[in-house]
């Protein structure tokens, strides 16, 4: 007996198929027909869940953010604020196959939003959530008395956000075969430098 899947699960399966197509063929290759074939669905079935291509791409981007947020929330507590922030920040980097695929999709759709107004809302939301995450990390350092006195929290949140984005872009550029451990060291050095 085939297992029935609910509407939300189908949405996620279609978004994951979208990710695979984007990683393999880029956003330009992510047509409704190609995504439906990747998911083993008819185009009509896909359109029943996502009436427009833009809605599918927007949901695919939102799912990247939801998955990253869930991973961060599931991290075990660390003994110090510095260790907590290092682990949270590292979780946002493409350090393994799954996170690498998510980051490739994130960057591709982030860029595609410049030409597609329907992707701008989820792109802007993703950017805002990243900035809020960076603010939270700086607040953790401050609350743990690990932030140097007189530190401009907003400026440091912007720097941390930019560092995470930059490291992620470099890791994607270097390819999956490259050793990503250097990025963890850069992150640890930066976060350590914020401590007073």
Predicted regions and their residues:
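Hydrophobic alpha-helical segments that form the core
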Residues: 104, 108-110, 133, 150-173, ...
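Actinobacteria-biased recognition of intrinsically disordered, low-complexity terminal regions
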Residues: 1-3, 196
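Amphipathic alpha-helical packing segments from all-alpha helical-bundle domains
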Residues: 74, 98-107, 117-143, 158, ...
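Helix-turn-helix
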Residues: 13, 17-59
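Hydrophobic alpha-helical connector segments
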Residues: 59-62, 73-103, 153-160
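Short loop-to-helix capping motifs
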Residues: 26, 112-117
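Solvent-exposed, non-membrane alpha-helical residues enriched in polar/charged side chains
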Residues: 19, 73, 90-93, 135, ...
């Amino acid at each position: 007996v085939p297992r029935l899947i609910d509407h939300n699960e189908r949405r996620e399966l279609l978004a994951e198929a979208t990710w695979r197509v984007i990683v393999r063929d880029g956003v330009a290759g992510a047509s409704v027909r190609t995504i439906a074939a990747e998911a083993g669905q008819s185009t009509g079935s896909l359109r029943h869940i996502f009436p427009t291509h833009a809605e599918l791409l927007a949901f695919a981007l939102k799912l990247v953010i939801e998955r990253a947020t869930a991973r961060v929330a599931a991290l075990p507590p660390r003994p110090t604020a510095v260790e907590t922030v290092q682990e949270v920040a590292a979780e946002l980097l493409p350090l393994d196959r799954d996170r690498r695929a998510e980051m490739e999709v994130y960057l591709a759709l982030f860029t595609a939003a410049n030409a597609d107004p329907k992707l701008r809302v989820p792109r802007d939301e993703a950017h805002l959530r990243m900035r809020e995450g960076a603010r939270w990390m700086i607040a953790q350092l401050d609350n743990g008395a690990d932030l140097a006195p007189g530190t401009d929290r907003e400026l440091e949140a912007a720097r941390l956000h930019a560092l995470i984005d930059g490291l992620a872009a470099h890791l994607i550029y270097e390819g999956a075969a490259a050793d990503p451990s250097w990025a963890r060291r850069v992150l640890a050095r930066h976060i350590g430098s914020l401590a007073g």
